[in-house]
């Protein structure tokens, strides 16, 4: 069997560092799609970390082929020596629509994570100026958006010492949802106490895996 990819297909080629709670690019894209969000609708990630959800949402809005900027192993194989991958990439990029990337934003309390998010957005070939990022605590966050989505990957608290802090953050997400009743809130977590910590049951749930870690995707209308 011939490996034509090289690195796993989940690696799009724009991330240089994964942060403390890495979210696979393919899973981030799935979270955006499963939420029901459509390009042009407001989307804010209140725990954006290194920007994977924001980047995948922007690539989806633009209509960019996944992994277009990464190197594939088949590019070095003799059997593909007659293929001009540069032309293929140029043709794919010509089909993208950068003007469709709008109303996407993020925030996080960690300034280093935000700097990495900006780098990843640039390395994905996106214009970072149209994806505003803000350093702010979740409990202080207020966004000027309506009829849109909060989509996030909050910390899971896999270590017992972190659980109390993470569960307090889940309730902060509940309060954020209360402050923005017209925005749907979508969050993925491996913590079985998420709904109890949040403050109410989700309107929809979907079981997913982040690598080998079993998670649930909670959607609140």
Describe every region a protein language model picked out:
Residues 23-142, 158-159, 165:
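Conserved S-adenosyl-L-methionine
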Residues 1-15:
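Non-catalytic substrate-recognition/targeting regions of SAM-dependent transferases
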Residues 4, 118, 198-199:
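Short, flexible helix/strand-to-coil boundary loops that buttress conserved ligand/catalytic motifs
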Residues 134-221:
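C-terminal catalytic and target-recognition region of SAM-dependent MTase-like enzymes
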Residues 13-23:
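Class I SAM-dependent methyltransferase Rossmann-like catalytic core
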Residues 4-6, 111, 156:
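Non-catalytic surface loops within mature trypsin-like serine protease
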Residues 7, 95-98, 153:
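A short alpha-helix capping/helix-coil boundary motif
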Residues 4, 47, 189:
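Glycine-rich, histidine-containing beta strand-loop boundary motifs that form or position
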């Amino acid at each position: 069997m011939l490996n034509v990819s090289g690195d796993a297909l989940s690696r799009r080629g724009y991330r240089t560092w994964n942060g403390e709670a890495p979210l696979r690019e393919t899973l981030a894209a799935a979270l955006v799609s499963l939420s029901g969000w459509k390009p042009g609708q407001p989307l804010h990630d209140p725990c954006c970390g290194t920007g994977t959800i924001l980047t995948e949402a922007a690539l989806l809005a633009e209509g960019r082929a996944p992994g277009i900027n990464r190197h594939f192993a088949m590019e070095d194989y003799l059997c593909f020596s007659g293929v001009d991958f540069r032309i293929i990439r140029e043709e794919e990029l010509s089909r993208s629509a950068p003007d469709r990337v709008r109303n996407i934003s993020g925030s996080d309390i960690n300034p280093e994570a935000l700097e990495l998010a900006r780098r990843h957005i640039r390395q994905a070939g996106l214009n970072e100026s149209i994806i505003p990022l803000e350093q702010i605590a979740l409990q202080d966050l207020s966004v000027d958006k309506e009829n849109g989505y909060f989509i996030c990957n909050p910390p899971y608290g896999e270590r017992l010492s972190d659980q109390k802090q993470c569960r307090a953050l889940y309730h902060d997400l509940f309060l954020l949802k209360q402050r923005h009743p017209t925005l749907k809130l979508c969050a993925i977590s491996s913590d079985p106490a998420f709904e109890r910590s949040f403050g109410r049951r989700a309107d929809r749930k979907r079981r997913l895996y982040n690598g080998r870690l079993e998670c649930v995707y909670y959607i609140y209308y």
